[in-house]
Curated annotation (Swiss-Prot):
GO CC terms of this entry: cytosol
Subunit structure: Monomer. Binds 30S ribosomal subunits, but not 50S ribosomal subunits or 70S ribosomes.
Biological function: One of several proteins that assist in the late maturation steps of the functional core of the 30S ribosomal subunit. Associates with free 30S ribosomal subunits (but not with 30S subunits that are part of 70S ribosomes or polysomes). Required for efficient processing of 16S rRNA. May interact with the 5'-terminal helix region of 16S rRNA.
Coiled-coil blocks: none
Subcellular location as annotated: Cytoplasm
Alphabetized UniProt keyword annotations: Cytoplasm, Ribosome biogenesis
Stated name of the protein: Ribosome-binding factor A
Record organism: Sorangium cellulosum (strain So ce56)
BP terms from Gene Ontology: maturation of SSU-rRNA
Main location: cytoplasm
Entry similarity comment: Belongs to the RbfA family.
Gene Ontology MF term list: ribosomal small subunit binding
Amino acid sequence: MSGVVKRATRVAERLREDLSNLLRDLRDPRIAGVLVSRVEITDDLQSAKVHVRHEFGAEDAAARRALLKGLEAASGRLRRDVARTMGLRVVPTLRFFYDEGPDAERRIEELLREIKDGSSGERS
């Protein structure tokens, strides 16, 4: 792994941690309970994809859109705070994406449980 890639990986992990902490301090109700699941950053540190999810899941598309709009509205403040906490010369542009993986996993588990419960009832 080259030094540039290693640095990008380290910065991405630190950015994930810092954003997680900074988001807890924001008072916007649209982003209450948001969790940062991962951050992907370009090698030149110019742009970061921030993958987020809701603590309790966001089943409907409207809730996801509201969450992402709240994050977009806060992105300027978050970039300023990241610049202060991380001490980077170049602060990446933050782009937010909803991470549907945990919600899909939870839904699959529910469906499997329903199937299991349904097949148990048929045997009785």
